[in-house]
Amino acid sequence: MPLSSVSAAQWRALSMRAAEPNGYYLPEWELAVNASARGRLDAAALGAWRDASTLIGLLPVISMWRAYKIPLPALVSADPYGTLCTPLLDRDMAEEAVTGILQQAPGAHSRRAPPSRTAIICPNGNWR
């Protein structure tokens, strides 16, 4: 799903409940990056919801090809400035959030990447 289509109110609420806060993934910051950072425009969002009104996990991503011109079937952080790419996970539903995010990964990859081989890569190594 396009990052810009995530409800800012749900996103903000998730950032307040996050198991590990991440300033690079606050809605105001990441939406500004999404609108203006060269090579990071129109990012995708891997998200997980408990129900239609409760976002429990969010990871803004782009393809590795768009980010680094490396032709691998991988997704990387949509934030070009930060070294922290820990996803926002609801502290009370982290397992469900991770499961939901990973289930979305094959559908969010580049059209050239086989769905079963899509990877999510975090440069600082704290989530794979």
Where are the language model's segments positioned?
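N-acyltransferase acceptor-side catalytic subdomain
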Residues: 1-128
